[in-house]
């Protein structure tokens, strides 16, 4: 009987049925429970015809502070967000989060994945703000794993010896415009490029898969 060999050029096989979704948030503070979520971006990934990870679908929202949210002026100065600017086009959390979920579930279906996993730079921060917003709006059908994540700061420290996003991108030869940093969409795009670069570099070096399916079952 011929043994089936896992094809890791399919995304569903590369991450054990998980769909990596790269996210970034901009906030009005550091406390996910009390401080406002102001901006959210998310990008899904897919495999190209050669089994290399590439960016796929994206969404981006400016978000209205939830009722009673804390707004730290120092945080606004840091990220350059003017929450009173009518041109922001901000939407409530109960619009942004479900729309992101729709995109993620659509990508999961296309890639044959059973669940999504958050990828972010210093991922515990972004995951905490997303989870807090999900809880506030009582969102249903959350596609994300409740605690698993891929932290690109940790991965970049391992791969390149750099944990700061701009430094890691430079090491990976990814162009980075510091003037656009702290825009959720730009940071998500660069984090996506970095994550793909690290996964693809490991493939090129022969570091994945480590053993054949037959060897792994011995």
Swiss-Prot record:
Q: Does the keyword Magnesium apply?
A: yes
Pfam families attached to this UniProt entry: RNase_T
**Organism listed in the record:** Actinobacillus pleuropneumoniae serotype 5b (strain L20)
Where are the catalytic residues? 182 (proton donor/acceptor)
**What's the Enzyme Commission number for this chain?**
3.1.13.-
Cite the entry's keywords alphabetically: Exonuclease, Hydrolase, Magnesium, Metal-binding, Nuclease, tRNA processing
What is annotated about its quaternary structure and interactions?
Homodimer.
Which PANTHER family does the entry link to?
Answer: DNA POLYMERASE III SUBUNIT EPSILON (PTHR30231), RIBONUCLEASE T (PTHR30231:SF2)
Q: What does this protein do?
A: Trims short 3' overhangs of a variety of RNA species, leaving a one or two nucleotide 3' overhang. Responsible for the end-turnover of tRNA: specifically removes the terminal AMP residue from uncharged tRNA (tRNA-C-C-A). Also appears to be involved in tRNA biosynthesis.
Top enzyme category:
hydrolase
Residues the record annotates as the site (Important for substrate binding and specificity) are 78, 125, 147
Q: Which residues bind Mg(2+) 2?
A: 24, 26, 182, 187
Q: Kindly state what the record says about how the cofactor is bound.
A: Binds two Mg(2+) per subunit. The active form of the enzyme binds two Mg(2+) ions in its active site. The first Mg(2+) forms only one salt bridge with the protein.
Positions annotated to bind Mg(2+) 1: 24
Q: What is this protein called?
A: Ribonuclease T
Under SUPFAM superfamilies, the record lists: Ribonuclease H-like
The GO biological-process annotations, alphabetized, read as: DNA replication proofreading; tRNA processing
What cofactor does its activity depend on? Mg(2+)
Gene Ontology cellular-component annotations: cytosol
